[in-house]
Design a protein with these regions (language model features):
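The feature captures the beta-strand-to-loop junction immediately N-terminal to the Walker
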Residues: 38-40
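Helix-to-loop junction immediately C-terminal to a conserved catalytic motif
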Residues: 53
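Conserved ABC transporter NBD signature motif
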Residues: 61-69
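ABC ATPase NBD coupling module
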Residues: 70-87
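Short coil-to-helix segment of the ABC ATPase nucleotide-binding domain corresponding to the Q-loop/switch region
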Residues: 97-108
Length: 129
């Protein structure tokens, strides 16, 4: 299991009241599977992505990335996990318009001086269609 989310809940405080952003979110993702998260603006998609990347913590529930509980990691270990295993491709307006789709996907690998950025980018673009 690459990703497993169990009963995830995220609440934020606003004055004297609590706002529930995510409630009882559960899913799992095996290697080679894809998952689309859709919904209107304000429905919690970005909050969910932040939790999955370890950028924020859930009110309750568990997230396992490669069978490692994000809840049990300190910030330094979450940062290492993000660096090694997590990446985002943002909506088109976040991409560099002067680069092709392939070049935009290659860019993070090139900035990190990784081997074979073109080959890796082509592989991932083929995986997502």
């Amino acid at each position: 299991m690459i990703l497993e989310v169990n009963k995830l809940r995220k609440e934020v405080s606003s004055g004297d009241s609590e706002l529930t952003i995510l409630d009882d979110v559960s899913f799992s993702l095996e290697e080679g599977q894809s998952l689309a998260i859709t919904g209107p603006s304000g429905s919690g998609k970005s909050t969910l992505l932040g939790l999955l990347a370890g950028l924020d913590t859930a009110t309750s529930g568990e997230i396992y990335l490669d069978e490692v509980s994000l809840h049990k990691l300190d910030e330094e270990d979450r940062a290492t996990l993000r660096k090694e295993k997590v990446g985002f491709v943002f909506q088109s307006f976040e991409l560099l318009p002067s680069l092709t789709a392939l070049e935009n996907v290659m860019l993070p690998s090139e900035l990190k001086s990784e081997d074979n950025p073109r080959e890796n980018a082509e592989y991932f673009l083929k995986r997502v269609g």
